[in-house]
């Protein structure tokens, strides 16, 4: 990036910071701040150990310096501006989850598709936070990173003093990688009527036993119930009976009688509903506990891809992490680091809603062809001298494929 381009970007960012609504963290004087400046480019030198005593001081600094990247600590410190970490005196830290396309298997290369995939993972994580962990919406701050993902900040006092090992355990739970499916399928002694109707399970010896799905109404148990019933519906939707339940047929205790009973359960009026809403598995299928656990174990990869949440473990485990500040700009894209209400996520489109610059025409010199979707437009930019809207110019320059203004010995705009 040449000096003229640097000056242009700084002026654009300064214009933003003049009126931007910056999401300053609570306990502002206890937060460390860090910055990367365009003047240091192409080196990404981080300037850290900075603190601010008041909102006005922080906002004046952002406007005056117009940094490329802005971070604050997720931790609270007694002395946030101390030069050595062991001198800061750690007081606690928010629980952070980072979802980024870099950490998703088989993430698409197309930026729009990549962001859509990350959004799906983010919605899954939101379900864990609200349902499994029971956090209130007031405890959760959701932020689009301005790049390729989202950040969750959990600010509940219950999590502030968690250490790295406890935070890693949370990541393990989210991933589901330590699940033992035998836990969910239990044979319990029963007292009461057989079949439908109310029952009380007392664990009394020598009573009849039945198979039930533990935790069917919440958490991983709910996900197991949904996966199992969806599988049964999909298999019974096949045209030929011989093609149904191929995974189960590989089990030595599954024969035609078992397959027939599974088909009857699926096609009955309340069979699948009883699994989802009551955890009922007492359908007269011999060895159902063993068969169900076998199927889930064989389907582990697909099950976890569908329901597990892929978060960046080092970020969550780090109790002294720096993270992007809501309302700032991402220096690698020029897009807004945007705070969202949880209800806004599903309809949020970063390629429109996080683009802050306008339509003013700007001349740039493009070093290689580049395609991107911004503001509802498919932009295909050819190499050479081009005139594009300012929002596209900022994005292309931040991505490193363009310089501001004309360059000699370049082809004219097409």
UniProtKB/Swiss-Prot annotation:
Q: Which GO terms describe its cellular component?
A: DNA-directed RNA polymerase complex; primosome complex
Give the UniProt record's GO annotations in the biological process aspect: DNA replication, synthesis of primer
Could you list this entry's UniProt keywords, alphabetically sorted: DNA replication, DNA-directed RNA polymerase, Magnesium, Manganese, Metal-binding, Nucleotidyltransferase, Primosome, Transcription, Transferase
A GO molecular-function annotation: DNA-directed RNA polymerase activity
Q: Which PANTHER family match?
A: DNA PRIMASE SMALL SUBUNIT
HAMAP family, sorted? DNA_primase_sml_arc
Function statement = Catalytic subunit of DNA primase, an RNA polymerase that catalyzes the synthesis of short RNA molecules used as primers for DNA polymerase during DNA replication. The small subunit contains the primase catalytic core and has DNA synthesis activity on its own. Binding to the large subunit stabilizes and modulates the activity, increasing the rate of DNA synthesis while decreasing the length of the DNA fragments, and conferring RNA synthesis capability. The DNA polymerase activity may enable DNA primase to also catalyze primer extension after primer synthesis. May also play a role in DNA repair.
Q: What is this protein called?
A: DNA primase small subunit PriS
Species of provenance: Methanosarcina mazei (strain ATCC BAA-159 / DSM 3647 / Goe1 / Go1 / JCM 11833 / OCM 88) (Methanosarcina frisia)
The gene that this protein is the product of is: priS
């Amino acid at each position: 990036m040449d000096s003229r381009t640097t000056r242009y970007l700084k002026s654009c960012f300064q214009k933003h910071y003049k009126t931007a609504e910056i999401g300053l963290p609570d306990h502002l004087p206890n937060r460390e701040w860090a910055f990367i400046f365009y003047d240091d480019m192409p080196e990404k030198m981080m300037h850290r150990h900075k603190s601010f005593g008041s909102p006005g001081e922080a906002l004046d600094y952002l406007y005056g310096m117009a940094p490329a990247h802005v971070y604050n600590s997720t931790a609270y410190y007694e002395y946030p501006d101390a030069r050595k970490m062991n001198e800061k005196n750690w007081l606690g830290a928010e629980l952070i989850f980072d979802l980024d396309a870099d950490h998703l298997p088989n993430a698409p290369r197309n930026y729009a598709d990549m962001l859509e995939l990350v959004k799906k993972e983010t919605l899954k994580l939101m379900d864990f936070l609200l349902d499994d962990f029971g956090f209130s919406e007031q405890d959760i701050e959701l932020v689009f990173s301005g790049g390729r993902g989202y950040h969750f900040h959990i600010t509940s006092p219950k999590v502030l003093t968690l250490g790295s090992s406890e935070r890693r355990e949370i990541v393990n739970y989210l991933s589901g990688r330590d699940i033992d499916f035998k836990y969910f399928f239990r044979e319990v002694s029963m007292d009461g009527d057989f079949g439908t109707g109310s029952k009380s399970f007392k664990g009394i010896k020598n009573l009849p036993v039945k198979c039930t799905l533990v935790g069917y109404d919440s958490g991983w148990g709910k996900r197991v119930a949904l996966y199992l019933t969806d599988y049964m519906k999909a298999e019974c939707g096949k045209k030929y009976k011989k093609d149904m339940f191929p995974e189960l047929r590989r089990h030595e205790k599954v024969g035609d009688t078992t397959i027939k009973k599974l088909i009857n359960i699926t096609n009955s009026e309340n069979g699948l509903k009883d699994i989802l809403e009551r955890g009922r598995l007492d359908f007269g299928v011999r060895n159902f506990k063993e068969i169900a656990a076998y199927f889930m174990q064989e389907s582990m990869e697909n099950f976890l891809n569908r329901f597990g949440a892929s978060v960046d473990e080092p970020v969550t485990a780090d109790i002294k992490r720096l993270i992007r500040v809501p309302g700032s700009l991402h220096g690698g894209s020029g897009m807004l680091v945007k705070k969202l209400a949880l209800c806004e996520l599903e309809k949020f489109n970063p390629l429109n809603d996080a683009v802050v610059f306008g339509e003013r025409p700007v001349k740039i010199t493009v070093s290689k062809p580049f395609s991107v979707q911004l503001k509802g437009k498919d932009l295909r930019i050819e190499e050479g001298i081009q005139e594009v809207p300012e929002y596209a110019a900022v994005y292309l320059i931040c991505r490193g494929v363009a310089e501001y203004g004309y360059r000699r010995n370049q082809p004219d705009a097409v």
